[in-house]
Amino acid sequence: MTVVSAFLVPGTPLPQLKPEVPSWGQLAAATERAGKALAASRPDVVLVYSTQWLAVLDQQWLTRPRSEGVHVDENWYEFGDLAYDIRADTALAEACVTSSPLHGVHARGVNYDGFPIDTGTITACTLMGIGTDAFPLVVGSNNLYHSGEITEKLAALAVDCAKDQNKRVAVVGVGGLSGSLFREEIDPREDRIANEEDDKWNRRVLKLIEAGDVSALREAMPVYAKEARVDMGFKHLHWILGALKGKFSGANVLGYGPSYGSGAAVIEFRL
C-alpha cells in the first residue's frame, strides 16, 4: 500500500499561537494526536496541500531541500510569530513537476531562499511534527484557477510518483470548514461557530466523512461549499480524495471547533 495514512487539519495558526484558549487548545491537541498517528503509520514522505499556498501561474511544487525562517501571519500577527524549519523530499517533488504536464497541468518547482512558506503548512508541520528529516514533505500549491477535480488529479499523480519510487505516503490536507469569520473583536474564550447554519452544515459533512459515505459526501460538497462559504471550496478534501483514489472506509473526527467564527476540524481517515 502506497498511502498509509491521511489527515485533514486546520490551517489557522490560532491553536498553535494561543493553545491556552480552551477551544483552540483542543484543536492543537487534536492536531498533535493526528501527528502521532501519522508517525505510527511510518511514511517515507508526507504529501501536503494547504489552501493558503496561493498560486495563479502554473502548479507549484516545493523543491527546496530545506526552508527555514520566521513567518508573520497577515491576519493574526498580534498573537505572535511562526518559526519554521521544513525539509522536503526533492526527488519526489521533482517527479511531480515532471509528471504534471503529462496530466495537462503546467507546473514548476520552487527553490529559492526566502520563499514565503504559508501559515497552514507551517502550523501543520509544527503541531504534527512533520517536515523533518524523518518525515519530509512534498507540498503542492493551491492554484486559484484549479477546480476540485484538477486538485484530485494532482494528488493522484503525486501518489503515483511516490509508488514509482517505492515510498510510503501520508497525505495531509490543510484548511478549514465553514468560512464565516467574526468581523469585530471577540474574547477568544467565547469563540464559537459564527452561526447555527454553518455549524449544522459542518456537522452534517463531518458525519458523512465519519461514515465513509463518499457518494453522499461528493453530492453535498458543492452545496456545502456555497452555503457555508467553505475554505477554498474544500479543495483540501479534494486533495485527500484524489490521493485515496476516491475511496476510504470511514474517519475519526479528533477535534471540531471554532476559529474566530469559522469552522475547523482534525480528521483521521480510515483507509
Curated annotation (Swiss-Prot):
Pathway(s) served: Xenobiotic degradation; nitrobenzene degradation; Xenobiotic degradation; 4-chloronitrobenzene degradation
Top-rank taxon, per record: Bacteria
Gene3D superfamilies assigned: LigB-like (3.40.830.10)
GO BP terms: catabolic process
Keyword Repressor assigned: no
Annotated Pfam families: LigB
Entry annotated with the keyword Magnesium: no
Keywords: Aromatic hydrocarbons catabolism, Plasmid
Molecular functions per Gene Ontology: ferrous iron binding; oxidoreductase activity, acting on single donors with incorporation of molecular oxygen, incorporation of two atoms of oxygen
Family classification: Belongs to the LigB/MhpB extradiol dioxygenase family.
Function: Component of the 2-aminophenol 1,6-dioxygenase (APD) complex that catalyzes the ring fission of 2-aminophenol to produce 2-aminomuconic semialdehyde. CnbCa may have a role in the stability of the complex. The complex is also active on other substrates such as 2-amino-5-chlorophenol (68% activity), protocatechuate (33% activity) and catechol (5% activity).
Other facts noted in the record for this chain: Not active on 4-methylcatechol, 4-chlorocatechol, 2,4-dihydroxybenzoate, o-nitrophenol, p-nitrophenol or 4-nitrocatechol.
Subunit structure and binding partners: The APD complex is a heterotetramer of 2 alpha (CnbCa) and 2 beta (CnbCb) subunits.
Protein name: 2-aminophenol 1,6-dioxygenase subunit alpha
Source organism of the structure: Comamonas testosteroni (Pseudomonas testosteroni)
